Amino acid sequence: MDIIICKDEQEVGKAAAALIAPFATKGGTLGLATGSSPLSTYQELIRMYEAGEVSFKNCKAFLLDEYVGLTRDDENSYFKTIRKEFTDHIDIVDEEVYSPDGANPDPYEAAAEYEAKIAAESVDVQILGIGGNGHIAFNEPSSSLSGLTKVQALHPKTVEDNARFFNTIEEVPTHALTQGLGTLSRAQNIVLVATGEGKADAIRGTVEGPLTAMCPGSILQMHNNATIIVDEAAASKLENADHYRLMEQLKLR
C-alpha cells in the first residue's frame, strides 16, 4: 500500500489523475466512483483531456453502484451523475460505460448479471472514495471482506445523508446494488482518494488499523497495488504520516 499525502484537495486530484491517465491512454478498463471524494480527480482528468494529454476513446468503465428502482436516465441515478460529473466531458463511448441495472424488477438478478460482466473484464484501475465510517461503495461496516456484487439495504443514516439530492427523504431509495469488497479487490490497481478532517478516522483505520469488516477500507491492506491519496486534513490522525512522506520522497521514479 502506497500512501501519498498532499497539501490540499486540488493536489490530491492531480496526484490521482497522474496515476490513472496512463491506463486511459492504453485503452484500459476503469472503475468509477461517484460522490464528492473523486471530483477533483475527474476535474483534473477532464483538464488533461481538453489539453490533449489523455484520451479515453478506447476505454471501458464500470460504476461502483446504483440505486434499486432508478433507471439510468433518472436525474438521481449514479449513471446520470457520472455522466454530468465526468464522462460527458471526455471522449469515452457512452455505450462503454456500465452500471448495475437499477430498473431490473429482480435486483438480485441484476446484481448477478453485473458481477458476471465485471468478472469477464479485468478492471485496470479502480477509483474509490471512502465514507467517514470507512465504508467503500455501499459496503458498510460489517460487510463481508470477500463479498461480491449484491443488493444492499441502506442504513437510515445513509438515507438521511442522501436526502439532500432528492426533493424529500421519502423519495430516497432504501436499497442499492453495489460491488462487493471481493469484487473491488480483483481490480489490478486501486486508487483511493480522501480529503477533509471528516475522513481522518476512516483513513487511519484503513491504513493503520487491523484488517476488519468493521472498517471496510482496511481490505486495501491486502491489495498488491493500492494507493491511498489524501490531503493533510484526512492524514491528520495517521501516526506514521512522516514515514509515509519520506517513503514517497524516496520512491524510484
Swiss-Prot record:
Disulfide links within the chain: none
Domain of life: Bacteria
Pathway the protein takes part in: Amino-sugar metabolism; N-acetylneuraminate degradation; D-fructose 6-phosphate from N-acetylneuraminate: step 5/5
Active site feature: D65, N133, H135, E140
Reactions listed under catalytic activity: alpha-D-glucosamine 6-phosphate + H2O = beta-D-fructose 6-phosphate + NH4(+)
InterPro entries tied to this protein: Glc/Gal-6P_isomerase, Glucosamine6P_isomerase, NagB/RpiA_transferase-like
One Gene Ontology MF term: glucosamine-6-phosphate deaminase activity
Gene Ontology process terms (BP): carbohydrate metabolic process; glucosamine catabolic process; N-acetylglucosamine catabolic process; N-acetylneuraminate catabolic process
Gene Ontology cellular component annotations, sorted alphabetically: cytoplasm
Record-listed E.C. numbers: 3.5.99.6
Group of enzyme by EC: hydrolase
Keyword annotations: Carbohydrate metabolism, Hydrolase
HAMAP family linked to this entry: GlcN6P_deamin
Protein family: Belongs to the glucosamine/galactosamine-6-phosphate isomerase family. NagB subfamily.
Function text: Catalyzes the reversible isomerization-deamination of glucosamine 6-phosphate (GlcN6P) to form fructose 6-phosphate (Fru6P) and ammonium ion.
PANTHER family: GLUCOSAMINE-6-PHOSPHATE ISOMERASE
Name the UniProt record assigns to this protein: Glucosamine-6-phosphate deaminase
